[in-house]
């Protein structure tokens, strides 16, 4: 009887882990300054356009999104406060992203600043999403 209970318990754990309908996304934010400003980090599903957001405190580097549905995503961030100046010399919030330039090394030779699509898989953790390109990531003028 004891062995049957153990078998049923282990089977339920296995079924629960196999039926996961979401994944986790872990990464870091960088900022070209001596500190990291408070910001909002976003994941956008490429198929549904649904956006997930997370608040990052000042000088916080790591972030973690839980229960993100499987799919293809892009990651980007906007500062909470206006800390940059636009082309018209007007204060603006800054934005950055996880772009093709990030895995390239963010050097002068890295010309592709388009957002990099990554996959979230059910029951898995997608790691190393680095929102570090604050010089060429092209996004909307305002945060979602």
State what each model feature region is.
Residues 71-87:
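A short, solvent-exposed beta-strand micro-motif common in secreted/extracellular proteins
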